[in-house]
Amino acid sequence: MGFGSFISTITYCLFFRYPHKKPKFKSVSHLNHYHTMPMARPLSLQTIDLKVRMCCSGCERVVKHAIYKLRGVDSVEVNLEMERVTVVGYVERKKVLKAVRRAGKRAEFWPYPDMPRYFTSSDHYFKDTTREFRESYNYYRHGYNLSDRHGNIHVTNRGDDKMSNFFNDDNVHACSLM
C-alpha cells in the first residue's frame, strides 16, 4: 500500500499538478491579437423596445423577471395590450433580446418607430408586414412572420371606409366611370 501511494503521488506531481499553459509571447503584436479587452457595458443610457408575444399577466411576470436578471437594467415597462416591452438601462440590445427568448417567449425588436398614423381601422393596427422579417436577428425562427401571413388575403393600407376605397382598382364594387 505504501508503494502504490508513492507512485500515485509522483504521477500526480508530474502530470496533473501543473496544467498545460498557453505560451506567452513577448511580441506586442501577438499580445494584442490574443488578449482583447472585455466588452463593457454601453457608455450611454439606452432605451430598447421589444415586441414580445404575451397573453396574460403570467407571461408579463416571466418577461420582467428575465430582463431584471440582466446587469445594468434600470426599468422595465410592459404594455400587455400592444405586446410591447420597453427597457431602459446600460445594457446591450441583443442581450435583452436573448434573455427574453431564453425565457421561452417569442421576441423581436419593435418594428414600428412610433404610433402608426396611416391606418384607418383598428383591425389593421400593428400589422405592417413590410418590416416584419429581419434576417440578422433570426426572425424566421423566432419572429411573427410564419403563421400570421399564411392564407391571409393582403389588405391595402387605405382602410375600410368607403370614401378611400371608392376609386380603388382593387375594389370590385368601385365606380365604373373611370
UniProtKB/Swiss-Prot annotation:
Ribonucleoprotein found in the keyword field: no
Modified positions (Cysteine methyl ester) in chain numbering: C175
Function: Heavy-metal-binding protein.
Subunit text: Interacts with ZHD3/HB21, ZHD11/HB29 and ZHD8/HB30.
Lipidated residues (S-farnesyl cysteine): C175
Propeptide residue range(s): 176-178
Protein's recorded name: Heavy metal-associated isoprenylated plant protein 30
GO molecular function, one term: metal ion binding
Database matches in Pfam families: HMA (PF00403)
Family statement: Belongs to the HIPP family.
Residues that bind a metal cation: C56, C59
Keywords: Lipoprotein, Metal-binding, Methylation, Prenylation
Domain HMA: 45-108
